[in-house]
Amino acid sequence: MANNEQKGGDLQEKLVQVNRVAKVVKGGRIFGFTALTVVGDGSGRVGFGRGKAREVPVAIQKAMDQARRNMVKVSLSGATLQYPVKARHGASKVFMQPASEGTGIIAGGAMRSVLELAGVHDVLAKCYGSTNPVNVVRATIKGLASMQSPEDIAAKRGMSVEEIAG
C-alpha cells in the first residue's frame, strides 16, 4: 500500500511514510508502527495526519482519519500557485514558486504528495535543510496555507485587484 492513492468520497489519500519504532523493555523490544498520510480533494483542500499503532493497517487508518480532520484551504491560481512562497518547520525549509502551464510538479517525494493532492499541477519546488518527511509535509502545508488570493490582499490594503497585480 506504499505510496498509493485511494478514493474516500471525493478525497484522495496518499501514504507518505510507514516507520517501524521500538520500545525497549526488560523482556526485549516491543515494535510499533507510525504512518504519515496526506489527504486532498485535488481542488484546493489538503491535510496530513500521523497515526501510531502496533499494526500497520491500524496506524494507516488512524493517520487517514486525522488527515481528514486537519484539512486546510489553499488559494490557487488555476493550476499553479499565486506567487513564490517560503516556509519552514523545524530544520526543514521549503521554497515553492509558480510555473508555466505544462511544467508539471517538480518537487521531491513528500512535497510532491502534498502538492498533487492540493490540486497544484504546475510548480517548481525545492526542499532545503532537513528532508525528514514529517517536517517537509508540515512546512509545505504551512506554506500553502499562508498564501492569500489577490482579492484578499486588495481588500486588506483597500486597493483594487488591478493595483495589486500591477
UniProtKB/Swiss-Prot annotation:
PROSITE patterns (alphabetical): RIBOSOMAL_S5, S5_DSRBD
Description of its domains: The N-terminal domain interacts with the head of the 30S subunit; the C-terminal domain interacts with the body and contacts protein S4. The interaction surface between S4 and S5 is involved in control of translational fidelity.
Stored NCBIfam families: rpsE_bact
Name of the protein in its database record: Small ribosomal subunit protein uS5
Native species: Chromohalobacter salexigens (strain ATCC BAA-138 / DSM 3043 / CIP 106854 / NCIMB 13768 / 1H11)
Stated family: Belongs to the universal ribosomal protein uS5 family.
S5 DRBM domain span: 11-74
Subunit composition and interactions: Part of the 30S ribosomal subunit. Contacts proteins S4 and S8.
Keywords (A to Z) from UniProt: Ribonucleoprotein, Ribosomal protein, RNA-binding, rRNA-binding
GO terms of biological process kind: translation
A Pfam family hit: Ribosomal_S5
PANTHER family, alphabetized: MITOCHONDRIAL RIBOSOMAL PROTEIN S5 (PTHR48277:SF1)
Molecular function GO terms recorded: rRNA binding; structural constituent of ribosome
GO cellular component, one term: small ribosomal subunit
Function: With S4 and S12 plays an important role in translational accuracy. Located at the back of the 30S subunit body where it stabilizes the conformation of the head with respect to the body.
